[in-house]
């Protein structure tokens, strides 16, 4: 491959106590929490809106955020849920502890922006991470490409909220990633209109009526109406009076760190969505006039880099509902390891793991602070999908409420590090836990 040497003088345009890279659910929680503690926080996002997959990615629903007795993403996450309820009374659950929230993307991105600006976070959109300047294991600055050109940001502490662990990996932190044969598939979520909800309810083919949907999928696959034998039909969610969000179909073997793979995944996903549009119109009552009006601007990546941290949260910890002395949160979503290949057998393996890993009412696993601390980089925390864990734990903690929890913990840890003039590893754990409890975090069973 041909190579060039690229040299350019780049202005250090911004300085902050804490720079958060990536405004997905985890990065937003980190930025708002750190700023709420008094730190000067800069949040940089490559897109034109906050929220990542929860908004730009068009993910239509929050995965469970409760253990059946209490809301687990207490603190930042609970504030988001309260504001979602206030804006969407007609679709809000009567009992938030035991129900699901549908995501209205426009409302959610405004809620995120309100929480960020109210806490004093400086937001910069359309700024894409381009390079990292590291000296002796410490990030001195990060370089971004923006409409104004390239610029650098310096900070005492950096937080990686990129989802893919890009900042950490480019800074020299070790990581692991599943092979192309094992990696979970991705989904391009979508927005649909023209649905007759009364007819849909009476038709019997709800997304939660698995047998009815599988029969229809099987018939369509055998008839050649769907190009792939993907029986893992993941979701239809009503997000407005006459619209729904689709978490439908998969693209397999996507490498989130490769622009060619991402591009092919997006192209293939949009083609498959048209297949499913025809399938729904033909086979599902109430969808005769339905149409897709929008698909996500981000491909729904379920698995990419997992940073190797000071501790690797594992499935045995999960199953034992283990608590940790440095626990900074708790969560309980089952191990939702989407099959890496289509087919009936792979679906059955997924269902077996998902059901067997479901925790009981009131149970949850602890999240230690150490999984946010990447090895070999001193002034960096990670949060969201790229935290240090095994694949089964990733399949639980990667969803939106889990990202709020790890983001909140990273933000508080960073703020205390700045205040104490120390590194994230030097933070007093008792003080960290005390401050998290003060803002509503759930730390113990």
Regions found by a protein language model. Name each.
Residues 136-142:
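Short, hydrophobic/aromatic-rich segments at coil-to-beta transitions
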Residues 12-16, 26-27, 55, 151:
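Ligand-binding pocket scaffold of soluble enzyme catalytic domains
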């Amino acid at each position: 491959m041909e190579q060039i040497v690229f040299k350019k003088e780049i202005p250090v345009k911004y300085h902050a106590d804490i720079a958060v890279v990536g405004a997905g659910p985890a990065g937003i929680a980190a930025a708002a929490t750190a700023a709420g503690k008094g730190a000067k926080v800069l949040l940089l996002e490559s897109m034109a809106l906050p929220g990542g997959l929860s908004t730009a990615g068009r993910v239509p629903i929050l995965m469970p955020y409760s253990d059946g007795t209490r809301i687990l993403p207490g603190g930042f996450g609970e504030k988001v849920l309260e504001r979602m309820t206030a804006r969407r009374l007609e679709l809000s659950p009567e009992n938030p502890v035991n129900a699901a929230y549908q995501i209205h993307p426009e409302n959610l991105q405004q809620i995120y922006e309100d929480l960020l600006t109210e806490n004093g976070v400086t937001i910069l959109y359309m700024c894409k991470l381009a390079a990292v300047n590291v000296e002796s294991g410490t990030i001195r600055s990060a370089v971004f490409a923006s409409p104004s050109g390239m610029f650098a940001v310096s900070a005492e502490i950096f937080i990686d909220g990129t989802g893919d662990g890009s900042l950490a990996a480019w800074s020299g932190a070790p990581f692991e990633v599943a092979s192309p044969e094992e990696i979970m598939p991705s989904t391009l979520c979508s927005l649909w209109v023209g649905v007759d909800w009364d007819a849909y309810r009476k038709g019997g083919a709800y997304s939660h009526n698995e047998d009815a949907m599988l029969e229809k999928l099987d018939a369509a696959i055998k008839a050649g109406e769907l190009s792939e034998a993907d029986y893992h039909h993941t979701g239809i969610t009503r997000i407005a009076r006459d619209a729904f969000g689709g978490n439908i179909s998969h693209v397999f073997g996507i490498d989130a760190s490769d622009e060619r793979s991402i591009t092919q995944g997006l192209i293939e996903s949009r083609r498959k969505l048209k297949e499913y549009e025809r399938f729904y119109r033909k086979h599902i009552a109430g969808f005769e006039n339905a149409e897709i009006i929008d698909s996500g601007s981000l491909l729904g990546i379920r698995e990419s880099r997992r940073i190797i941290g000071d501790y690797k949260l594992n499935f045995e910890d999960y199953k034992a509902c283990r608590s940790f002395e440095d626990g900074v949160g708790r969560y309980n979503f089952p191990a939702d390891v989407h099959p890496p290949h289509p087919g009936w057998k792979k679906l059955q393996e997924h269902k077996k793991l998902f059901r067997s890993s479901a925790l009981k009412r009131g149970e949850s696993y602890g999240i230690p602070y150490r999984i946010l601390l990447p090895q070999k980089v001193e002034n960096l925390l990670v949060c969201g999908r790229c935290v240090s864990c095994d694949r089964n734990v990733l399949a639980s903690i990667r969803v939106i409420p889990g990202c709020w929890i790890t983001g909140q913990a990273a933000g508080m840890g960073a703020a205390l590090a700045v205040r104490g003039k120390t590194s994230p590893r030097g933070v007093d754990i008792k003080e960290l836990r005390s401050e998290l409890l003060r803002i509503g975090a759930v730390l113990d069973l």
